[in-house]
UniProtKB/Swiss-Prot annotation:
Protein name per the record: Leucine aminopeptidase 1
Span of the signal peptide: 1-19
Predominant place of localization: secreted
EC number: 3.4.11.-
Propeptide section residues: 20-88
Regions crossing the membrane: none
Role according to the record: Extracellular aminopeptidase that allows assimilation of proteinaceous substrates.
Cofactor section: Zn(2+)
Any GO BP annotation: proteolysis
Disulfide bonds: C322-C326
């Protein structure tokens, strides 16, 4: 792999960049300089594909472009119809669990999210091919496992499993059985990247450490419900933490490809990616809000999420767009499952520090993250007991 010119950093001197490279993640030596770099097939829009190296992936990131890495699909001879019409799901027309949700929501803790995120961002990077990326996944798995073990759910079939990939960082899936196999999914991605060079420090506090700890806290409080913990919800619930989102939604594509092959009955998928930055909205002179994505999502699920935000959050929503393949919900859509995405703000007001070493905890608003946790908790609880 060729190293991109350090001049691309612009704002950082080369000595600062080299100092930020972890000792166990040194650049490749000269003995490999003549090897041809591995290439990957990416899709930047429906039908718009190209072969690129991994360095070229990060160049696209620097340009603000998003994509699926569909190499595995080609190798397996399976290319799903892009954004097929999802199965018909009748989402509720109104909120039906207000008393239960509001009682549970009072137990959500900003302190828990802060403590988890402080630890999670202490890893040099969570780059999906790095040693630190595997270590961070192991740490996160332990937190999710402890969350489930500390609840009644562990006695009623709840489990936490790794979903292994061909690269070292695994995805994580927590499952809480319901009375049917119809499944409600909430996701976030656990990896991080420095778009200038993968070995450079990438704390990934907002992208997507914030979503990672937001849904972890929602899971903790959800399991305080005896009805959920004891398996009495109508539908099964899953919480996902995906690997390798930054490299082209690799982890989530692997998960939903497997689910499709197994004929899993996934009724909804909500992605929480970047939940912590509110200052961009305030600096623009606008009211604090959460951003409901309206492109490449399921309209019925998205409309119900708007009701959830209105009913359970203390701030309003705004409608915004993020483009093709912009986060892991797109993988669910790709395989025919209804999906939605709620981000921290209008897309243009979201954090500009992502994919750099400056995406750190100090710039995040944990009161804002609490609103995302309320929305996540409310949505999951409502859909867990709905006839979908």
């Amino acid at each position: 792999m060729k190293l991109p010119a350090l001049l691309i950093l612009g704002v950082a001197a080369s000595t600062m960049v080299l100092a930020a490279i972890a000792p166990d993640q040194v650049p490749l030596n000269d003995a490999k300089k003549d090897e041809l770099p591995e290439k990957f097939l990416i899709e930047l829009a429906p039908g718009d594909t190209r072969w690129v190296t991994e360095d070229e992936k990060w160049e696209l990131k620097r340009e603000g472009l998003k994509f699926f890495d569909i190499t595995a699909e080609v190798e397996q001879g399976f290319l799903p119809k892009v954004f097929p019409t999802p199965a018909v799901v009748n989402f509720p027309s109104e909120l039906n669990r207000t008393a239960e949700v509001k009682q549970l929501a009072s137990q959500l803790s900003k302190e828990n999210m802060f403590n988890h995120l402080t630890n999670f961002t202490s890893f040099h990077t969570r780059y999906y091919k790095s040693t630190a990326g595997t270590q961070s996944a192991t740490w996160l798995f332990e937190q999710v496992q402890q969350t489930v073990n500390n609840s009644l759910a562990v006695k009623y079939g709840a489990k936490v499993e790794t979903f292994n990939h061909s690269w070292s960082q695994f995805s994580i899936i927590a499952s809480i059985p319901g009375r049917t196999n119809k499944t409600v999914v909430v996701g976030a991605h656990q990896d991080s990247i420095n778009m200038y060079l993968p070995t450079i420090q990438a704390p990934g506090a907002d992208d997507d450490g914030s979503g990672t700890v937001t849904i972890l806290e929602a899971l903790r409080v959800l399991l305080q419900s005896d009805a959920v913990a004891q398996g009495n919800a109508t539908n099964t619930i899953e919480f996902h933490w995906y690997s390798a989102e930054e490299a082209g939604l690799l982890g989530s594509q692997a998960v939903f490809s497997k689910y499709k092959n197994e004929n899993r009955d996934i009724k909804s998928m909500l992605q929480q990616d970047m939940t912590g930055y509110s200052q961009g909205t305030l600096d623009a002179g606008e009211q604090e809000s959460v951003g409901v994505i309206t492109d490449y999502v399921h309209s019925g699920l998205t409309e119900f999420i708007m009701k959830v935000i209105t009913g359970y959050c203390d701030i309003p929503f705004v409608l915004t767009k993020c483009g093709y393949a912009c986060s892991d919900h797109a993988s669910a859509s790709r395989y025919g499952y209804p999906s939605a995405f709620v981000i921290e703000s209008k897309f243009e007001h979201s954090s500009q520090r992502i994919h750099t070493m400056w995406d750190t905890v100090e710039y995040l608003d944990f009161d804002h993250m609490l609103q995302h946790a309320k929305m996540t908790l409310g949505l999951v609880y409502e859909l867990a007991f709905a006839e979908l």
